[in-house]
Structure formats: C-alpha cells, structure tokens
C-alpha cells in the first residue's frame, strides 16, 4: 500500500475507482482525501456537490487493491455523524468479485470474510500491541516476502500466511523479536514462530471485532490476497495516523 496524496493524471479503470455517498453538506475535497489517503496513492477526487441534492464523490486510486481496501475499511464509517456509503460504481466491478490483485487472482469471497486464498506457510505472531491491526501486521511481515493472508486477535496474537515456504522461514529468522509499530504509534517487540497444527479457533472467537464504528475502525480485519514483494532488509516502520477530522 503506497503513500497518500492526490496525483492528477489520466483516468484509470473502474477497478481503481470508488463511489462515496452520504457525505455531509459542507464536505470539501481535502476532507475526502483525509478520509482515504491512508489506503494508498489517490489519482483523483471528483466531488459532486450540486445544489438541492446531497453531495457525493468518486475517488480514484493508483492501485485497484487500495481501492478494494478503501471500500472495505470505509463503508459504514461514521464521519461527523454521517455514515458513509462506499462502494464500487455500479458500472464497475462488485465488492464480491475476486479475492485480490497483484496477479494472483483468487476465489470469490464474502464481503466481510477473509479471502479464500490461503496457504500452509503460516507463522504465529505474539506480543502485538492492542492497537495493532491486520494491515499493520501485514505491512511488517511483507519485509520477508509475499503475504497472502494476515489476521489479528484480541489476545495480542496474529497469524500470517506466505505464498512461499522460503519466505515463511525467512520471516521467522529475520523478524522474530523485532520492533513492531501499529498505525496508532504503539510499539512492541513481537515473537514470530512457525505455526503447528492449525487451531480451529483462529478466525472465529478470538478474532478482533469487525465493528465499523468510528472508534473501532482500526479493527477491520480483512486481508487482501497477494501483496507486492518488498526487498529484504531491515524493516521499515512508518506509523499511519489518520488525518480525518472524525477522531476519537
């Protein structure tokens, strides 16, 4: 997931474009950017604020995977008392269409469930701070290779699945006992170990709440399939504080 900022350029395809409705009457383009910038580089924001009708907007990302994350993370988001409606335009794709991007594809998934693309190359992570989200964990573990699934649980543990076994092995060797930083700036040293026989509890009772309310938006637990691989080396940490004026 790349950095924020609006990049003006030629229009892309509908996979990168999302619809944002139920906006407050005094909404500005900059406010919309503040709500969505953390999901990735924004190519364009087209705010429609016609007199006599409620405002709405189209936001276009550089990467279709960032658009998918924005739909999942911000649909139903409470912005100054307005519950945002965020979806792909009806002329484009639907949110239930494939399980990810990056050339990997994937099986269809439910809107609120993780993608069906899974891997046996799984590690268990412990010692996560309370504000650590699946996206924070995924970003941290990408230093080892291509992550196809990540999730976090209430007890400070998480699971990460890699596309390749060698990346899983590398993650245990290089990321065990490293400093983890959440999007809220909390830090902790985490432990990374190869998972044993799969526990049926993962992904159910121990999963963090998927509440989409303003004060729990960090807990949206959904993984997009396949992630671009970063070069191996020392992990990079960049806390992502939301600049939205809708704060807790």
UniProtKB/Swiss-Prot annotation:
Residues 93-108 have a biased composition (Gly residues). Keywords: Acetylation, Cytoplasm, Isopeptide bond, Methylation, mRNA processing, mRNA splicing, mRNA transport, Nucleus, Phosphoprotein, Repeat, RNA-binding, Spliceosome, Transport, Ubl conjugation. PROSITE patterns: RRM. The keyword RNA-binding applies. Residues 88-134, 191-248 are annotated as: Disordered. Its main location: cytoplasm. Residues 16-91, 121-195 form the RRM domain. Consists of two polypeptides of p32 and p33. Identified in the spliceosome C complex. Component of a ribonucleoprotein complex containing mRNAs and RNA-binding proteins including DDX5, HNRNPH2 and SRSF1 as well as splicing regulator ARVCF. In vitro, self-associates and binds SRSF2, SNRNP70 and U2AF1 but not U2AF2. Binds SREK1/SFRS12. Interacts with SAFB/SAFB1. Interacts with PSIP1/LEDGF. Interacts with RSRC1 (via Arg/Ser-rich domain). Interacts with ZRSR2/U2AF1-RS2. Interacts with CCDC55 (via C-terminus). Belongs to the splicing factor SR family. Plays a role in preventing exon skipping, ensuring the accuracy of splicing and regulating alternative splicing. Interacts with other spliceosomal components, via the RS domains, to form a bridge between the 5'- and 3'-splice site binding components, U1 snRNP and U2AF. Can stimulate binding of U1 snRNP to a 5'-splice site-containing pre-mRNA. Binds to purine-rich RNA sequences, either the octamer, 5'-RGAAGAAC-3' (r=A or G) or the decamers, AGGACAGAGC/AGGACGAAGC. Binds preferentially to the 5'-CGAGGCG-3' motif in vitro. PANTHER family: RNA RECOGNITION MOTIF RRM DOMAIN CONTAINING PROTEIN, SERINE_ARGININE-RICH SPLICING FACTOR 1. This is Serine/arginine-rich splicing factor 1. It comes from Pongo abelii (Sumatran orangutan).
